[in-house]
Amino acid sequence: MGKRILFFLLTNVLVMTTIVIVWSIISRFTNFGGSFETGGPGLGIDYASLMVFSLLVGFTGAFISLAMSRWMAKKMMNVKVLDPNGPLTERERFVVEKVHRLSRAAGLMHMPEVGIYQSAEVNAFATGPSKKRSLVAVSSGLLDAMDDDAVEGVIAHEVAHISNGDMVTMTLLQGVVNTFVVFLSRVAAIIVSRFVRSELQWIVQFAAIIVFQILFSILGSIVVSAFSRYREYHADRGGADLAGRDKMAHALRSLKAYLDRTKLNDGTDDSAVQTMKISGRGGVMKLFSTHPDLDDRIARLEQR
């Protein structure tokens, strides 16, 4: 899921920044859009209009990001989509059959696209704007490093994300976060622009909006990451229901064993495994991790 969240957050930041830049340019050179400054008492900001604007931009950006998620993932990772009716290798056929079988067990009416991408990293992700237009992709490194039961557990976990509707839920949360990001960045930019000469206020405010929006987006990702960690436990339970608790636990232990071997071989954490956030992080960086600590996930699964 780490890849899925990374794609979504990256796309969201790009979409939101583009919307704000276009809106700022249009409102600067036309009467459309206008200013949220009233010149009244206090900061002189029309908070009601700014909040409506922030809601529209925030949720528009989130849902555009959702709509682009599957396409973005396939392009960025160079995913080879597998045709279930076409010629496939034995390993490819295994992945397709497992995804379809587990999807049917999860009650999905439309089978997800299935893909493999060439990478040494041990990873898999599910993405897509809806249950009807979803994608489950696994890395070649995962297929090389894991046995069939572990691969099935990983696939079950990803199918559970689709069945649980995690992308849509994440989008709604991101829309709320975006709303506050837009609102607060505008207020902060207006305040900053008051400290420069009037002829420079527009360009300073424009630049400040971009800077504050990126800064607040990073802070907002803490909220999104916390929700992602919470949903990972649900996906583990869903994967256990679909493939069996033993296979789901075996998949998590296999991931941990791979990480431990990597540390033993070179004395450092494998960056590819860190992409999955399966090892957990300490200190402040733990706030930005999209996955809980792997030992904690195994312990919770075994307590079911």
From Swiss-Prot:
Q: What is its EC number?
A: 3.4.24.-
* Free-text cofactor note: Binds 1 zinc ion per subunit.
Its membrane topology: Multi-pass membrane protein
- Pfam families, per database record: Peptidase_M48
Q: Does the keyword Phosphoprotein apply?
A: no
Concerning PANTHER family, the annotation shows: PROTEASE HTPX
Name recorded for this polypeptide: Protease HtpX homolog
Q: Which gene encodes it?
A: htpX
